[in-house]
């Protein structure tokens, strides 16, 4: 854009967030820093990003008619999807009408489910991936498992935060994994992907920025997953120059194919001298929350700069850093956090982000601890120490 306006004025620059969780909250804050009028949307009230937006709306974003009516009402200059469960056909129609969908409506459609992006990467771009089959019915699923063999990974084609994902290692786990995948899909029961298990040495998130001044890469981020969801992430992940170059090549090809401006979280498996494409999100990635302390520009700041057509320039990484999630289990609409002075005082320079989620029902990520240290291993342990010390009361 040639100019950025002032909120609530006739010339305001308006951005609509579709999805208002903790990642959307940080995007909203970065938009606010540049004077953008922020409209936060989600399926429930008082979502984290709504708490820092100029105004908010509660709708089902899978309801294409409701979504279209809201966009026509607000007339945002930028529509910024922050989750997968959105009526992507509606976004494509809105883009055709002249609305700016970030990064593109095509990218949102292809990445809203694992089938679109896997077919793009493996079949169109010919990038290395694990072997895979898609299944619509339980019979197709069982046949796919037989063809892939054990161990294999089962995922709903549309889910987030590890929901519905499992590793099947023997025959008596097959039926259970199917049911778990059906329960964990974002849109309810539906297709699954059956993947061959890659016995990787490690996995990384390569945050890749497509901006007016070209494609930029953050230092690779390592992470540990448990039950399909990340628990700790760290930057930089140590890897050879050759592997980093291969990783950047894969990420560049995927991002170029998806098009548009913004930050992309490209997930890759590293095995020996090989790099395998796993998934990509056309938006900030949960493992990238470590960049809130590890870089001069966080993934959220980079996303916003790219969206607004601002140059990225040089990304400065400060050295070994880690994040550890504050994960708790319970049921409450009155969540309180204690022992914060002690939690932070034990590690000089430690930081904490509490997401402000309005309720917990079961297991939920409520915050993240952030630490810089002399080495990655120490940063991970210290971040876990801070996260564990937070006293969450329901």
Curated annotation (Swiss-Prot):
Catalytic activity, as annotated: N(1)-(5-phospho-beta-D-ribosyl)glycinamide + formate + ATP = N(2)-formyl-N(1)-(5-phospho-beta-D-ribosyl)glycinamide + ADP + phosphate + H(+)
Pathway: Purine metabolism; IMP biosynthesis via de novo pathway; N(2)-formyl-N(1)-(5-phospho-D-ribosyl)glycinamide from N(1)-(5-phospho-D-ribosyl)glycinamide (formate route): step 1/1
Listed transmembrane segments: none
GO molecular function, one term: ATP binding
Pfam families membership: ATP-grasp, PurT_C, RS_preATP-grasp-like
PROSITE patterns according to UniProt: ATP_GRASP
InterPro entries in the record: ATP-grasp (IPR011761), ATP-grasp_carboxylate-amine (IPR003135), ATP_grasp_subdomain_1 (IPR013815), PreATP-grasp_dom_sf (IPR016185), PurT (IPR005862), PurT/PurK_preATP-grasp (IPR054350), PurT_C (IPR048740), Rudment_hybrid_motif (IPR011054)
Residues at which Mg(2+) binds: 267, 279
Alphabetical UniProt keywords: ATP-binding, Ligase, Magnesium, Metal-binding, Nucleotide-binding, Purine biosynthesis
Superkingdom, natural source: Bacteria
The protein's assembly and partners: Homodimer.
Family to which this protein belongs: Belongs to the PurK/PurT family.
PANTHER family hit by this protein: FORMATE-DEPENDENT PHOSPHORIBOSYLGLYCINAMIDE FORMYLTRANSFERASE
Name of the protein in question: Formate-dependent phosphoribosylglycinamide formyltransferase
Gene: purT
